[in-house]
């Protein structure tokens, strides 16, 4: 019976496909014919317009050529009308074919969609009838209990894991306290006690007390009570894990708690920038190079022009070398301008003065010349810090 229906469906599909192809071919032929007729109609209209224009420009005298042309124009007009009617008819047929093609394709799609659904139903029905007792269906939800017995049948469902919770209940207050929680494998645990809760995912059994018997029977639990019990069991498990993790880590925590030692030493002080430059001292000697000297009038302007801002002011610059250090200390130093000192003239004996001048006159000229020498000996602005 099933084979006959399958063959019938297959034949219907093949027939629908053949009709669809035939209809598509017919539509393509109609479209091609419609395009040809439109092209021919356009040609006839342009020909008639040209002949009418030629007749209007010809003389009024009748001739055989004019009569033949008029006759041809009448025939063209008849053909034009026929082509117009044919074009309209083809358009209507083409539209009807396209509509019927869309309807047929829709029915074919619905039939193709319905056929697999029927086959699936037929396949599912025998599988359900042929499934033997004692087997687990994979599409069913897996219970969290070790083995779940289904009422009225011998079908059993394998559990993924089991949790054994030790509970202490206060008879006065009715408060439940979780003492311990242990996760067990399903194969290492068997069903004991009385079932107090069951849903699609889990089953709860009340196990006997220490004396081996349930005291005062077992009361069924609600879903909220079961959730609260599992939540407390999770808290106990986490607390045990935290306590076991803190024991080996006590030494490391004590090491981390050791305070850092302070190392006493010198404190670095930031050096202040000053326009005067660094002050020389024994701890901070200054190396300088002689670059020459120049007499200045306006110190600030000269610094800007020559780029001497930030130089060191020196009241007195002494230039000496190894040879000068070996000389006796009593010898006078060279002046700041770098010229050697002139040897002191020997004092004139007696009252003899060259040029017939008096001694008092020479002393007066020497005193007048001293201010000129002081004006030339300005402070040196010629040293820079390396």
From Swiss-Prot:
Gene Ontology CC annotation, any one: dendritic spine
Protein's GO biological process: adenylate cyclase-inhibiting G protein-coupled receptor signaling pathway; cellular response to electrical stimulus; cytoskeleton organization; negative regulation of adenylate cyclase activity; positive regulation of dendritic spine development; positive regulation of filopodium assembly; protein localization; protein localization to plasma membrane
Lipidation (S-farnesyl cysteine): 383
Tissue: Expressed in the lens (at protein level). Highly expressed in forebrain and cerebellum with lower expression in adrenal gland and heart. Expression weak or undetectable in other tissues.
Keyword field contains Signal: no
Propeptide: 384-386
Modified-residue entries (Cysteine methyl ester), positions: 383
Domain of life: Eukaryota
GO-annotated molecular function: D3 dopamine receptor binding
Membrane topology: Lipid-anchor
InterPro entries assigned: Paralemmin
Biased composition (Low complexity): 97-116
Location of this chain's protein in the cell: Cell membrane; Cell projection, Filopodium membrane; Cell projection, Axon; Cell projection, Dendrite
Post-translational modification: Phosphorylated.
SS bonds (residue pairs): none
Keywords, ordered alphabetically: Cell membrane, Cell projection, Cell shape, Coiled coil, Lipoprotein, Membrane, Methylation, Palmitate, Phosphoprotein, Prenylation, Synapse
Basic and acidic residues bias spans: 24-40, 68-95, 259-282, 322-334, 365-377
Assembly notes: Interacts with dopamine receptor DRD3.
Family note: Belongs to the paralemmin family.
Function (record text): Involved in plasma membrane dynamics and cell process formation. Isoform 1 and isoform 2 are necessary for axonal and dendritic filopodia induction, for dendritic spine maturation and synapse formation in a palmitoylation-dependent manner.
Protein known as: Paralemmin-1
Species of provenance: Gallus gallus (Chicken)
